[in-house]
Amino acid sequence: VVTARRLDDGREIWHKRLKPVIKDDKGIALKGAGIAYNGQRLFATTGFGGVFALEMKTGKEIWRYDTEMPIRIAPTTENNRLLVQTIDNTLIALDALSGKEIWKYKTTAEATTLVGGASPAYSSEEDVAVAAFNNGELRAFKASTGTPLWSEMLISPKRTNSLANITAIKANPIIDGDKVFAAGHSDVLMAIDLRTGKKIWEREISTSNQPWIAGKFMYVLSDNFELIALQKDTGKVVWNKKLPVPEHNAGLSAIGPVLANNSLIAALSDGHVFAISPYTGAILGFINVDDEIGLSPVIADGVVIFTTNDADLLAYK
C-alpha cells in the first residue's frame, strides 16, 4: 500500500493498494520495495515484481509494468527515465511517461546475499546510469541506450570475517559531478571517474548505508558504528566518531547519516538517534524513539521522518 500524508500533521490524503498481475499470487507476498518521485509522478516498486506510476495528488494508477521477478530495491528516476533493478541482477530502463521498456541488462547473481540492495544512480546531464549488483559489481551504462561503459568490483582482498565475504552492495552509489562514490559490504569505499571508470581513491570502510555528500566532504556511517568524515576529492579522513553502542550489540545495525540544520543525524536500529557535529564529530544530542527502525531517515522542510519496522511514521522538527 502506498499512502500519502500531510507533512504538518500526518493526516492521510490518499492510499493506493498495489496488486499483483496474478491475483492469487501469495508467494513472495505484497511487500513494498520503494518509491521515487520525479517532480510530476510517483513511482513504486513491489515485492511481486510490479512497477507502478501514480498520480501524485490522487494516487490514481497511470501505468504498470511487470518485471516477472521480485524487486527489493527502490526505483531511480530523473527527467523521463525510470531505472528498476530486480533480485536476479536485472537492470531495466523504462520510459517514465509511458512505462515502455527501453533497454535491459542482466548479470550473474550470487546465491548468498543480503536482503535489499542499492538503487541505481543516474545523471541525465551526463547520460550515465550506475548500478550496483549483489555480486559486488559496480557498472556504468549509457543511460539512453544501455551500452555498458565500464565496471569495477567492490570487493576487498583483505576480507576478515564471514559477513565481509558476502559481496552484495547495499549502499546506494552516488553521482556527484564527474565522480561516482560507491561503498561495498566487504570493506571497500571508492571514488571513481564517472566517464572513464578510473579509480581515484579507495578506503577500507564497509557500510550498508549511502554516504552523505556536503560540499567538499563525505560522511559515511560504517557497519562498525563509526561515523567518518572524509575529504571528498582525496578520501583523507578528517575525523572518526564511534557511536555509543552496548557491549553486546548482536543484531544491531547503524542507519544514516543525513544532514539537517547543520547536524548529522545517525541512528541505531534499536531506536537511538544522535545529532552529531559535521565539523568535529561531537555528539550534540540524542533521543530514543522507543521503536526499532530499519531505514535511513528522510528530511523534508526541516522535518526528520523515521519509518519504524512496524511501518509507523515518526516525524520530528
Per-range role (PLM):
Residues 1-17:
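Beta-propeller domains
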Residues 12-36, 63-78, 101-126, 151-175, ...:
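Extracytoplasmic beta-rich repeat domains
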Residues 46-47, 86-87, 133-134, 184-185, ...:
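Structural signature of WD-repeat beta-propellers
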Residues 7-9, 55-58, 95-99, 143-146, ...:
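Short loop/turn segments that connect beta-strands within beta-propeller blades
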Residues 263-311, 317:
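C-terminal closing repeat unit and adjoining cap/tail of repeat-based domains
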Residues 217-232, 236, 240-275:
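Loop/turn-rich, solvent-exposed surfaces of beta-rich toroidal or solenoidal domains
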